[in-house]
Swiss-Prot record:
Homotrimer. The lineage of its organism: Bacteria, Thermotogati, Deinococcota, Deinococci, Thermales. GO terms for biological process: regulation of RNA metabolic process. Its cofactor is Ni(2+); Co(2+); Zn(2+). Substrate binds at residues 74-77, 96. This is 4-hydroxy-4-methyl-2-oxoglutarate aldolase. It catalyses: 4-hydroxy-4-methyl-2-oxoglutarate = 2 pyruvate; oxaloacetate + H(+) = pyruvate + CO2.
Amino acid sequence: MEARTTDLSDLYPEGEALPMVFKSFGGRARFAGRVRTLRVFEDNALVRKVLEEEGAGQVLFVDGGGSLRTALLGGNLARLAWEKGWAGVVVHGAVRDTEELREVPIGLLALAATPKKSAKEGKGEVDVPLKVLGVEVLPGSFLLADEDGLLLLPEPPSGVRSGG
């Protein structure tokens, strides 16, 4: 991804912007891709299930309700995401294994880190519209992330491809 979110936001005013309240934990600060969505709460079984699918340069956006009590992604799932071809994962919640996460060459954004693991019950919803920080995150939209924030567009901008 060469284009910056600030420049693209100016070019595409219809885009929705999420402020950079997220911290970068992965090996790439900039990434882009079509969005898959997931709504869970302190349970990451569905996170694993979705990341086991071929990522094809997509970005998984996980709405964990902003909970910082348990981690929805750690080193094992981050490596799985990379091996399956995901461009990145955004977690509106917490992650763990931060030292391992830095070694994985994909975008990994989350609100914070915590050592506590999550439940594994499989509760949640896949590919549903999300509302995060007042912004609608739709399955199939195109997400671009860099140090200035996250930009959501209905379609990929000209010349921008999925990946990091």
